[in-house]
């Protein structure tokens, strides 16, 4: 309901293209040419990494557009959506809902996000933990901003105890931003609340004028507490299977949450086509996806630590590292090819 941008890198768009969705998503989103790492206070360029050089593999898009496209294609395949069906508990093949309804299924796929009740009840008996980080998320109409080519690309500003990301969505007509900062506690019962513009401008008052302009002209602002869970030890328990943030919720520092959820779903469907034996499919899914999800989850935490350095010597080393290895770090994540990984999986 709040609207937020999402970045889809090659590891996801490769699969969306295979499903026939990529061109439609491109028509609704934006194809940024570069991602720029900058200093927080003066916007000085640290490293620029090219995107979409040879093909349209990196799409920035409004999350609502992504969901709508997927939903419409799902319904066109005679898929069914049921609302007001919160899962109460599962017993063997029977699924019970809070509305007193019941259904049966040989398999239950839980993709109910970081707050996943199914994960807590049937996998690790743990609840998400506040990460001591908060995020302000908002959108600003491009027409409200100064004439600046900055808005046409992805820009990441690295500062002490926080960072800011902004990028174009909706054919370049909106600029989506995320501003992340350390915060000791999160006392709001909900994980998201309406954002206070004065608080946001005060917290980032020492940052550069471009981001302050972006904030001040936003017509949509919400504040989120960022939560995390420990890496999971298994993705399958009997006839229960975890996908997406229910399986590997990650802090948003590598922009891979949605991408890995797409990898999960595509991988499982292809594995099931190859081998209709459900137990074998579940075994292969865990073999294929557990390590990948946990690895990116850990990398995201490390990236957050690197983004928020405050010691000037460590900042110098980080910036030097980015200048040398920035491109290869990006490629190492985006080059993952779920189609090839499935083919190479031992029988």
Labelled PLM ranges:
Residues 1-4:
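Glycine-rich FAD pyrophosphate-binding loop
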Residues 9-141, 184-201, 344-347:
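Conserved N-terminal helical subregion
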Residues 23, 142-150, 172, 185-186, ...:
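Short helix-loop capping/hinge motifs at secondary-structure junctions, enriched
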Residues 27, 45, 213, 254-255, ...:
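C-terminal helical "tail/cap" subdomain of flavin- and related membrane-associated enzymes
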Residues 92-93, 148, 159, 221-230:
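Short gly/ser/thr-rich secondary-structure transition/capping motifs
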Residues 109-110, 166, 199-200, 220-309:
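Conserved mid-domain beta->alpha element of the FAD-binding
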Residues 115-116, 135, 162-165, 247-248:
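Histidine-centered metal-chelating micro-motifs
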Residues 152-187, 197, 201-205, 226:
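Active-site substrate-recognition segment that forms the wall
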